[in-house]
Amino acid sequence: MIDLHCDTMMQLLDHPDSGDLYRNTWKIDIEKLQKAHSKIQDFALFINMGETNDPYGRYEEMRNLCVSQIHNYGEHIQHVLSYQDVESVYKSGKIGALISIEEGGVLGGDLNKLKQAYQDGVRLITLTWNYPNGLGEPHCGEQHKKLTSKGVEFVEAMQELGIIVDCSHLNDAGTEQLGDILDVPFIASHSNAREVRAHTRNLPDNLIRLIANKGGIIGLNFAQNFLGTSPISRIEDIVKHGLYLIDKGGEDVVALGTDFDGIPPDTEIADMSQMSRLYDAFKEAGLSVEQCEKLFWKNADRLLKEIL
C-alpha cells in the first residue's frame, strides 16, 4: 500500500503526549502501517498560514520532528529521497517515508527556500491550502484565477528539482494550467470526484481526465465532507468515488490519499491497520486483483519512478 497524504506529524508536534511515530493514539503509526502492509507513507508537513506568525519556522520544527522520528525507528522505516530508496525499502520490508509540504506559501516565494526544502528531503509539495498564497488561488477562492508568475516559476523549478507537484486544494484554473506548464505528471494527492460529491475540493471530470492524460494520479480522500452526505466517512462512499475516477480517468489514475489525522476522526475504517477492509470492498465492487493493486500501490509506484 502507498498512501499519498496524512497529517500525523502535525498531531505529534501539537500533542507530544499522544505518543510517537512507532505507537500513538492517532490513525497512523508504524505499528498500524505494518499491519496494513504499507510500502510508502507520505507524511505531510502542514502549516496553517492563518495560525502562525512564523510559517517557515513552523515548517522547520515539524520537519525536524519528522526526520528525527524516522531516524529513531530506522529498523522499521526509511526516509525515501529517490526511486533507488523506494526499491531499497521494497527489498528490505521497511516502510518508506516520503516527506511533503502542504502549503507551498510557507516557502515565501523564495526559490532558494525551495531548493533548501529539496535538500531537507521534501519530495512533494501541495501548492496551496485554503488561502491565496502568492503562488495560486485555493479551491475556495476565485476559480478563474490562474497561478501567479511566481507560482509558474515555482512549478517549473519543482519539475527541474524532481519535486512532485500536487494540485489538491488548488482551484480549477490553476490545476488546468499545470497541464500546460509541466512536461511530467502531476498529482492530486488527496481529492475526490466533484460529480459524486459537489465540493470545490473535489475534481470535475475535465480535470480528472487532464491528470490521467498527463500520467498523474488522484489519491482518494477519506474526509466525510468530500465523500458524501453521511456524518461519518463510509467505505461505500470511498468505493463510489474510486469507481467514478476509474470510469472517467481509467484504472491508472486512482490511488490512495487518506488524509488520516487531518480529517474528522469518525471513520468507518478506524485507522490505517484496517485498510484491508477497503481492499475487500473494491474487490466486492467488481475490481480485479490487478486493478486493486494499481489503486493500492502500483499507480503511485509508477509515478514515483517517473519523478523521483
Q: For each predicted feature, which ranges?
A:
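Extended, charged catalytic domains and RNA/DNA-binding interfaces, predominantly
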Residues: M1-L220, N225, L243-I246, V253, ...
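Soluble non-cytosolic domains of exported or imported proteins
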Residues: N24, I232, E236, I269-S273
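A short, acidic, flexible beta-alpha connecting loop/helix-capping segment that sits on the rim
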Residues: F46-N48, G262, F296-R302
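Short, solvent-exposed loop/turn segments at secondary-structure boundaries
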Residues: N53-P55, A198-R201, S230-S233, D266-I269
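Hydrophobic, well-ordered secondary-structure segments
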Residues: L147-T148, V152, I208-I217, F222-V239, ...
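Short acidic/histidine-rich active-site segments
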Residues: F222, K248-M272
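Active-site/ligand-binding-proximal alpha/beta "capping" segment
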Residues: S233-E251
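Mid-to-C-terminal alpha-helical segments outside catalytic/metal-binding sites
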Residues: A270-L308
